[in-house]
């Protein structure tokens, strides 16, 4: 159990059999009446965001999530197959369970799979990944002076904005949290 006074960004709680993550919270102490905690909660499984208010000190069940490091080994139909490299146990997740993370997921990548009551909820990618540019407009000599960007499609199908001087076949580092270009990757 966790008190509403102890909420922090990222805290996970259980409400009506579902896991919710605290996205924002604000402790409010009005001049008249009792204190309360106004929160913005995100459903871990579906991604829905709701605003909910709790009395100060209200006790709620804390959802104990388990993180396991798994490697994406291959695709089977629409399912993504992950393997625990220590036990060689396979876990299958659908495209819906992976959600937006699938645009950066490639075979051989190590990810954290977050589970609750032995049910996989979400895939946590590393903060940055190295991917190859598969499709982009060719760079024209002299384009670098303006510092502009152009769209590029990466090997996983993700689309990011990259500097004009990059071309097809180059490996770049991308921030998975905000889809931004971080730099070229050497090697």
Swiss-Prot record:
Taxonomic superkingdom: Bacteria
Main location: cytoplasm
Listed GO biological process terms: peptide biosynthetic process
CDD domains in UniProt: S1_EF-P_repeat_1, S1_EF-P_repeat_2
Pathway annotation from the record: Protein biosynthesis; polypeptide chain elongation
Record bears the keyword Cytoplasm: yes
Pfam family of the protein (one): Elong-fact-P_C
Keywords recorded for this protein, A-Z: Cytoplasm, Elongation factor, Protein biosynthesis
Subcellular location: Cytoplasm
Function comment: Involved in peptide bond synthesis. Stimulates efficient translation and peptide-bond synthesis on native or reconstituted 70S ribosomes in vitro. Probably functions indirectly by altering the affinity of the ribosome for aminoacyl-tRNA, thus increasing their reactivity as acceptors for peptidyl transferase.
Recorded family membership: Belongs to the elongation factor P family.
NCBIfam families, per the entry: efp, PRK00529.1
UniProt-recorded name of the protein: Elongation factor P
Phylogenetic lineage: Bacteria, Bacillati, Cyanobacteriota, Cyanophyceae, Synechococcales
